[in-house]
C-alpha cells in the first residue's frame, strides 16, 4: 500500500488493481489474521499424496452457504478466489462468501486441520494450532454436529440440502467418479463417519497483484505511457502477472528478475546524466 501511494503521488499509472492471488482461508473473529487450512491432511496442495497415487485418508467437500458444491475441491489454490467470488445477479448476493468445508471424524482425527507449514501457524508461530484440534473446537473455529442435520442448523444452512449434497458426494465415491466437478478419483472418500465438522471459509491469502504500471525496463509509467524519470518498480507491487499467479515462488522470481532489470537500467540512466 505504501509503494502504491508513493508511486501515485508522483504521477504513476496503476494496473492489475482488481487482481489477487488468493485461495480459501479461514478467518475467525477473535484472531487478527487468516489461516490456511490443510483440508486433506497431506499439505494444502495434496500433491505428495496424489503423486504417489495413494488414496486420500479423509474426505472433505466445499459448499456454498446454501450447502451446494460448486467446484472441484482439488483446486488451483491461487485461482480459487475467482470461483468463490461468483455473483448471483438474481439474488443480488455472493452465495459462496462465506463457503464451508465439510468433513468428518476421519479428518479431525488425522491431525491438525490448520496448516502448520505457513500462515499464522507456520514458522513465525503467531498461533500454535492444537495437535488434536481440541482448542479450535472449544473456540468455535471448528463447528461440530453429531449428524449432518445438526451441523447444518449450527451453520445456518438448510439440513435437507446439505444432506442431499453429501448423499450425492458419497454416491460419487462409491462409483469412483465425480461427473459434475471431476474431482480426482484418489480424493473420492465418503463422508460417513460421524460426528461431522465444518470450517467457515473466505477468499484470501497470499497477495494482491496491483500497483504502478511498468514497462520492460522496469520503469514506472504515467497514465500516458511515458516513463517517469528515475522511478523503477519490481515484484508484486504492480506485478506483471495480472489475473493469474503462475506458481508457488513466482513472486520471488519476479522480484529477482525485475529487480535486476531495474538496477541495470537505473545505473544506465544515472550514467547518462
Label each residue range with its predicted role:
Residues 1-32, 88, 252, 258-261, ...:
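Glycine-rich loop(s) and the adjacent beta-strand/alpha-helix scaffold that form part
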Residues 10-19, 69-71, 160-163, 273:
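Acidic/polar loop patches that form or flank catalytic/metal-binding clefts of enzymes
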Residues 36-86:
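Phosphate/diphosphate-binding loops
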Residues 55-57, 206-208, 248:
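Short, small/polar residue-rich loop motifs at catalytic or cofactor-binding pockets
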Residues 65-66, 216, 223, 257:
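Short, ordered coil/turn segments that flank beta-strands lining enzyme active or ligand-binding pockets
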Residues 161-245:
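A glycine-rich dinucleotide-binding beta-alpha-beta segment and adjacent secondary-structure elements
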